[in-house]
């Protein structure tokens, strides 16, 4: 499914707060998705597991035009989530590996 979403207010809010628009929207999407139990189901082996929360992830661009992956610990406080996500992106940016799950 594809839908058009008017993000004008969110964009302005991000500018007013001085935060990343993409991280603000990511937080809101994850908050909405986590409220739907079915979105928290995962298949592990031969059973279905329902998680209490979701682990948002994003790609992080590097100066050499490659990218890395970053996983962000969810926090219900939008500004706390954004601050931690920015720090995680900076930590992952110079990483030579495609995936670094050392935080887990």
Sequence positions of predicted segments:
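Acyl/amide activation-and-transfer machinery of modular secondary-metabolite enzymes
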Residues: 1-12, 53-76
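Hydrophobic "lid/gating" helix adjacent to the active-site nucleophile
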Residues: 19-56
